[in-house]
């Protein structure tokens, strides 16, 4: 399956079989997240893999029931401490020549502060970066014949307590993964004419 096929075949699966996900498949899915691009190569994503029956049952108490039916759920978090490593990430990009020809090519990484952002902007920035990693995982799962469902409907405070997340971590999304009980039809999508505002 190529990327185009994975994009076309991916569906949000809400009815999972009880079959376990193979460890090697789960590792490939997590590796797809690890390889995702991010602003300044910040890589602010952190993941908690929920597989045990006990923890899956606890998940039901803070999100939709079907999440507990999935054999594995990846809790997708952002790490606000990642911002403290921005200078290190910038230096790495300089060392591999990724910033050649840009204003950041010769800047002193130790003095780089990035653009000034409000707390809301920082949150949005980290969430957007995490989103890329989540979609990578969803597409990798599809290629492996697995279903997933990216959702943000959960009680964040309760989930953080259940998982004992550090204060610097924010759970942003859940990605239950498993073998779908059925093969749902393609969902309706808007036409290109509706979504492309202009070509200038």
Stretch-by-stretch model annotation:
Residues 1-200:
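Acidic, surface-exposed loops and disordered segments
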């Amino acid at each position: 399956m190529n990327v185009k096929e994975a994009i076309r075949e991916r569906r949000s699966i809400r009815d999972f079989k009880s079959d376990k996900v193979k460890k090697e498949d789960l590792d490939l899915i997590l590796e797809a997240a690890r390889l995702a691009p991010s602003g300044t190569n910040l890589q602010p994503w952190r993941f908690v893999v929920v597989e045990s029956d006990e923890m899956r049952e606890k998940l039901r108490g803070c999100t939709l029931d079907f999440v507990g039916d999935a054999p594995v759920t990846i809790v997708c978090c952002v790490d606000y401490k990642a911002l403290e490593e921005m200078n290190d990430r910038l230096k790495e990009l300089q060392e591999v020549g990724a910033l050649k020809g840009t204003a950041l090519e010769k800047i002193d990484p130790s003095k780089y502060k990035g653009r000034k952002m409000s707390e809301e902007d920082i949150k949005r920035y980290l969430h957007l970066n995490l989103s890329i990693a989540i979609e990578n995982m969803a597409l990798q799962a599809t290629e492996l014949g697995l279903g997933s469902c990216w959702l943000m409907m959960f009680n964040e405070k309760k989930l953080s307590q259940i998982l004992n997340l550090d204060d610097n971590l924010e759970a942003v999304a859940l990605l239950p993964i498993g073998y779908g009980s059925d093969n749902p039809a393609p969902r309706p999508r808007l036409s290109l004419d509706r979504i492309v505002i202009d070509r200038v």
